[in-house]
Amino acid sequence: VLVKVSCCNRYPDATADFNKYMNQGSLLINYTGHGGEQGLAEERLLDVPTVSAWENIDNMPLFITATCEFSRYDDPSRVSAGELCILNPEGGMIGLLTTVRVVQAGPNKILNNLIWDNNLLEDSLITPTLGDIFTKCKNLGGLYGHRNFTLLGDPALTLNYPKHEVITDSINGVKASSFNDSLGALDLVTITGHIENKNGSYLSQFNGTCFPIVFDKEVTQKNRQNDPNAIPQEFKVRNEILFKGTVEVVNGFFKYSFYLPKDINYSFGQSKISYYANNESEDAHGYYNGLTIGGSNPNAEED
């Protein structure tokens, strides 16, 4: 929500959300838009006092800033907000793929897409280092102004991806790969799955806990257009949680059941199940998006 103050406009809820993701823990945060040495966005989504106040020493993400000179480090008269993200002794960022000079929207978008498409999708058995990521992306496509982009942080560092995969095996007794039915409000759902390594081998020695989250379908939203001269922007979000639970993993296998709530989105579409699992020494992640949800069960049992 836009808040007008004497000097300018602010979005305090957006800043609060940013701080929430910092404190709760995120693997990486990506920002594309206006910015400068003292912060992000004209409305100061992020500024020097905010960065200085972070205390997330155990939850530091990688920060990608497709913006202008956020991390300029050669001005002796001031310390940029990007530098403070690294220098904050109580928290901040584990590293930044960022800018030190004014850049244009075109090269910003190109480099941003290259980082995601070529490296951060983790499509190989070897997780690339931050130095490998940035070197490869800057050398692809003849990027204009590539010297304005830099890496702040340890180039030998790799992101802390979960080591193993969580796989969905069956839904209501039917193999997940063959399940083509739809599920509606008040339906009972039983899901089984297992943990495997990156080579696809079942991990029968994995004993721990799995945390499944079942999301409803994506919905399209539109921005508030607080600036009447701006072009309205549509975007997709998946915020509605239908089930969130804790499941025991025994010998690499897990099983859980739940009822779909009454207040789902009744249109038909693909939901998504996100997984995280861990034990005392290892962790795993995964997702499943082959589950169609919509409508309701007319024969549901009464409470």
What are the residue ranges of the model-derived segments?
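Short glycine/proline/serine/threonine-rich loop/turn segments at secondary-structure transition edges
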Residues: K262-K272
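Cysteine-dependent hydrolase recognition
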Residues: V1-T246, V250-Y259, G269, A277, ...
